[in-house]
Amino acid sequence: MPAMDVLLANPRGFCAGVDRAIEIVKRAIETLGAPIYVRHEVVHNRFVVDDLKQRGAIFVEELDEVPDDATVIFSAHGVSQAVRQEAERRGLRVFDATCPLVTKVHFEVARHCRAGRDVVLIGHAGHPEVEGTMGQWSRERGAGTIYLVEDIEQVATLDVRQPDNLAYTTQTTLSVDDTMGIIEALRARYPAMQGPRHDDICYATQNRQDAVRDLARQCDLVLVVGSPNSSNSNRLSELARRDGVESYLIDNASEIDPAWIVGKQHIGLTAGASAPQVLVDGVLARLRELGAAGVSELEGEPESMVFALPKELRLRLVS
């Protein structure tokens, strides 16, 4: 039997928004001292969150868990206007680690709200990004309504108030194919519906989904490194399975079941946008222990995007 090899997806792992969010927490701790409070997990990865806890970050779900006069960081997923207003009312020092591509969606929702349009948000109920985006809507600013649609079946039962004054936005980490199907169904039902000037699904989500499909065409098993609460990581594993390949989402190398690789010749390996390279390296080491002989990296879409840090943290680092 030929030796088992490993194919690495490209790109994989951290995106620009995740890099920025983690760096904001690290620099805030370095420059202001611990503890620094973070509302929600700054990114959805257990390893990253545990590392930041050891450095002095305290993760909370609501601002009432943050003491007066403390510093709080908003996670990469974004927050509602109500959360921002509460932080301002209490005089908390805030650093905003919201991904700029999520902020773009927030601006779209606020713009439609001011214009009095109805808005359909395509996303997963309960996800913090969706909660933050829904929370950009204010009835005080406009006469429209915001609706959440999770799947194509819900389009058939959707009943908007203003079908001729309607727009849509999306969560940034969705399956590209599923989202396009929902948008097509919405357009068929509401032909006058407006869309964003540019796709709301972020470049990193698109690139990693394209890369995992490239893997699936060449492998008989795909492992995705990412935490169970990571939306984009879950989508990667789903896509591989949808393309007919056995796939598992794992937090780290310890979760690999040796039975998975029995009889497999080509193992594909990728990582969600919130999973660090050190976890990928650990999985590679474990696969070598289990008999993997060679490792190669597929060609993929180059990524060079960098998002600026908050000005105060940049200045503090220089000084």
UniProtKB/Swiss-Prot annotation:
(2E)-4-hydroxy-3-methylbut-2-enyl diphosphate binds at H44, H77, H127, T172, S230, S231, N232, S274. Dimethylallyl diphosphate binds at H44, H77, H127, S230, S231, N232, S274. [4Fe-4S] cluster binds at C15, C99, C202. Keywords: 4Fe-4S, Iron, Iron-sulfur, Isoprene biosynthesis, Metal-binding, Oxidoreductase. It catalyses: isopentenyl diphosphate + 2 oxidized [2Fe-2S]-[ferredoxin] + H2O = (2E)-4-hydroxy-3-methylbut-2-enyl diphosphate + 2 reduced [2Fe-2S]-[ferredoxin] + 2 H(+); dimethylallyl diphosphate + 2 oxidized [2Fe-2S]-[ferredoxin] + H2O = (2E)-4-hydroxy-3-methylbut-2-enyl diphosphate + 2 reduced [2Fe-2S]-[ferredoxin] + 2 H(+). Catalyzes the conversion of 1-hydroxy-2-methyl-2-(E)-butenyl 4-diphosphate (HMBPP) into a mixture of isopentenyl diphosphate (IPP) and dimethylallyl diphosphate (DMAPP). Acts in the terminal step of the DOXP/MEP pathway for isoprenoid precursor biosynthesis. Belongs to the IspH family. This is 4-hydroxy-3-methylbut-2-enyl diphosphate reductase. The gene is ispH.
